[in-house]
């Protein structure tokens, strides 16, 4: 039976952040089952950063090269910090069966309009830690198969 390819997109699993630790725990568990072909898309590091070679699964950074970010406006720079363009490259290259995005809701702006969004199984795991719940989260929920 062919293994399902699962792309997990969040902070780098070795980053000292809540998202990083959460992602590390999830990746370790799934890796140890031996059932999945895992792809880590890591916010905060570049596509082929040296750190991508330090984990036992395939890992790519979601951060473009600094020269690509310099000409962008602040909003575009923030979006690229969350991998807005490189997520498309990862989807194209690795052809995952499942995309799991784990991040604050503003990291996923425009994702539901991406051509691949409804072509694969998508899941967003986001923090809902404010009251009232941010309108972005309420608007995005019906656009995600697994929220």
Where do the language-model regions lie?
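Extended catalytic core of nucleotide-activated donor transferases of GT-like folds
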Residues: 50-146
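N-terminal subdomain of nucleotide-sugar transferases
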Residues: 1-49, 53, 94
């Amino acid at each position: 039976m062919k293994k399902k390819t699962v792309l997990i997109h969040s902070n780098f699993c070795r980053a000292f952040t809540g998202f990083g630790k959460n992602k590390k725990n999830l990746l370790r568990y799934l890796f140890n089952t031996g059932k999945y072909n895992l792809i880590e898309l890591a916010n905060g590091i570049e596509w082929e950063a040296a750190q991508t070679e330090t984990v036992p699964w395939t890992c790519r950074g979601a951060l473009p090269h600094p020269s690509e970010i310099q000409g962008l406006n602040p909003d575009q720079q923030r979006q690229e910090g969350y991998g807005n363009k490189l997520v498309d490259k990862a989807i194209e290259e690795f052809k995952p069966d499942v995309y799991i995005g784990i991040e604050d809701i503003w990291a996923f702006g425009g994702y539901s309009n991406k051509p691949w969004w409804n072509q694969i199984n998508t899941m967003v795991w986001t923090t809902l830690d404010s009251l009232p719940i941010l309108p972005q989260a309420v608007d995005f929920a019906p656009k995600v198969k697994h929220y």
